[in-house]
Amino acid sequence: VGNLLISSLALEKNGYDIFRKYPALFKASYAMLKYSFPNLTVSAFGDTGRASQSAESLEIGLLGAVKYNQAELPEMLASMKKLIDGGIYDRKKSGFLGLLCYMPEIPEAKTNYQWPRTGTLEFARFFLQRNGTDPKTGLMVGVQGATYNHNHCNGMAMELYGLGEVLGI
């Protein structure tokens, strides 16, 4: 998704309304945080590695949200604040892409990020439930069981989060 978003950024900068034409691509720029454990990492979905919300993707999405006056802008700003406050992202290290393409300043988030207590990633058949969002005291369970999405040969995968760690898979 990251490379598609970078390509979309180039097209947007040259007058093509890619995010308006393909709203799912815009939504992909900020989707991962809502599936994250309280330590800001995402489920391994069976056999993949652990990732987190891409700050680069979120920066590109913020450009689209501002340009098209999207209702998601406050949530996206709160997501970016969460990544910066959590030590996941430092804008000073965004390189040439950040220097040449990102907004000069990120507008101040007026709200904190609101973690959904429960959620579903439908295509992956991933279901989550949280109890608290503090990285040390929060709890979360994620269960995934799609037949085509990185699952183990033994069927369903479950991850438990507590005490700041993913405790099982």
Model regions: which residues?
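Extended polysaccharide-engagement surfaces of secreted carbohydrate-active enzymes
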Residues: G2-I169
